Amino acid sequence: MQDHNRHVWDERVRKGLLHTRTARDDEFKNPLKAINGRGWITGSIKGKHVLCLAGGGGLQAPLYAAAGAHVTVVDISQEMIDQDKRIAQERGLELNALVGSMDDLSIIENASFDLVTQPVSTCYVPNILKVYDELSRVLRFW
């Protein structure tokens, strides 16, 4: 299943299809507003450690980085990760971009993140409980 999903997302990027667009110039003018349209994030995220889980593509991770967060993005698609790297380089942003599956975050240490963001994506894993087990391990709880 994961190999199939990886291939499909890589192809979607190559074709420029829906859900593969990168962040726009206007979104970088106020990156926190662009990523926080519903107002769920209160205050600044400057200096916070943010995991963009299955959030590759050059949209979310660069905007979080532009808002001052220390960002790691994990995505199953190399093409989506490459877009994050390209946008970060073009904008002079730092982010850690990793190819991996959201249900196996063994490449990440325990209690590494203050915030996790995840677009609709758990429908792509065979066992959602593994995802949430991994999230509970990598999140910091204050």
Set out the residue ranges of the language-model regions:
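Conserved class I S-adenosyl-L-methionine
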Residues: 1-46, 59-60
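Class I SAM-dependent methyltransferase SAM/SAH-binding core
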Residues: 48-105
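A short acidic, Gly/Pro-enriched loop at the edge of an enzyme's catalytic core
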Residues: 103-116
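A short SAM/SAH-binding and catalytic strip from SAM-dependent methyltransferases
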Residues: 114-129
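A short glycine-rich, Lys/Arg-flanked "PGG" loop and its adjoining helix->strand segment in the class I
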Residues: 129-142
